């Protein structure tokens, strides 16, 4: 994957 989706880091 070339596109890095900026997903928020949500702790479990």
UniProtKB/Swiss-Prot annotation:
Modified residues (Pyrrolidone carboxylic acid): 1
Keywords associated with the record: Hypotensive agent, Metalloenzyme inhibitor, Metalloprotease inhibitor, Protease inhibitor, Pyrrolidone carboxylic acid, Secreted, Toxin
Gene Ontology biological-process entries: regulation of blood pressure
Any single GO CC term annotated in Swiss-Prot or TrEMBL for this entry: extracellular region
Tissue/organ expression: Expressed by the venom gland.
Subcellular compartments: Secreted
Molecular-function annotations in GO: peptidase inhibitor activity; toxin activity
Family: Belongs to the bradykinin-potentiating peptide family.
Function: This peptide both inhibits the activity of the angiotensin-converting enzyme (ACE) and enhances the action of bradykinin by inhibiting the peptidases that inactivate it. It acts as an indirect hypotensive agent.
Protein name: Bradykinin-potentiating peptide 12a
Organism this protein belongs to: Bothrops jararaca
């Amino acid at each position: 994957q070339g596109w890095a989706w900026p997903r928020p880091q949500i702790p479990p």
